[in-house]
Design a protein with these regions (language model features):
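Conserved, well-structured core segments that form the ligand-binding/active-site neighborhood
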Residues: 1-101
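Conserved small/polar residues in nucleotide/adenosyl-binding loops
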Residues: 178-180
């Protein structure tokens, strides 16, 4: 799963994989990420997924090879072939083996699973987004993240050190308008 593209694999090897920074910024824009469909496990109507798929089709991807990893990062399954068909098969496998009934708790402890997934603070919301579904109302989420590479970029550092929620919201709205 991917916390705003729905699932990893397939079209992600093109976007963000080999695209320009400008294209990645547009795909990862506030406007796109703020869509209610830009969420873990959601592909239908997901603007980020749809944009990634359009980019992959634009360059006429003929073949993909994707794998699923276990907790020890060992390959447990693989899919190859048509961009959409092979990706759909992988998604079905992941849905079957990774989804479980939701359990809520007052305190949820989470991580991204180690380097490079927790390389900086910018990457950390992935763990929080997943934990959010498990935290009860007024629950507490404790995120464990090494951040070996620091904050994750000057723009991100500026955003999280801005101050008030209104200042942050204004900044994000400005960014959203710039990427319409």
């Amino acid at each position: 799963p991917h916390f705003f593209a729905g699932f990893s694999g397939g079209r992600k090897s093109i976007l963000p994989g080999i695209c320009s920074q400008e294209t990645v910024n547009e795909n990862h824009s506030y406007k796109a990420i703020s869509s209610p469909y830009a969420n873990t496990g959601v592909l239908e109507h997901n603007p980020i997924h749809e944009d990634m798929l359009a980019a992959a089709k634009m360059v006429n991807v003929q073949f993909i090879f994707n794998v699923a990893l276990d907790g020890q990062k060992k390959i447990i399954a693989a899919w190859a072939g048509d961009l959409e068909k092979a990706h759909a098969e992988g998604v079905a496998f992941i849905r079957k083996w990774s989804q479980c009934p939701s359990i809520t708790g007052d305190i949820v402890v989470t991580s991204n699973g180690g380097y490079p997934l927790d390389q900086n603070l910018y990457q950390s919301p992935k763990a929080v987004a997943t934990a959010e579904a498990c935290a009860g109302e007024d629950g507490v989420i404790i995120m464990c993240c090494s951040c070996a590479d620091g904050m994750g970029g000057t723009h991100f550092e500026k955003l999280i050190t801005m101050g008030t929620v209104d200042e942050i919201d204004g900044y994000l709205s400005k960014i959203g308008r710039a990427h319409v």
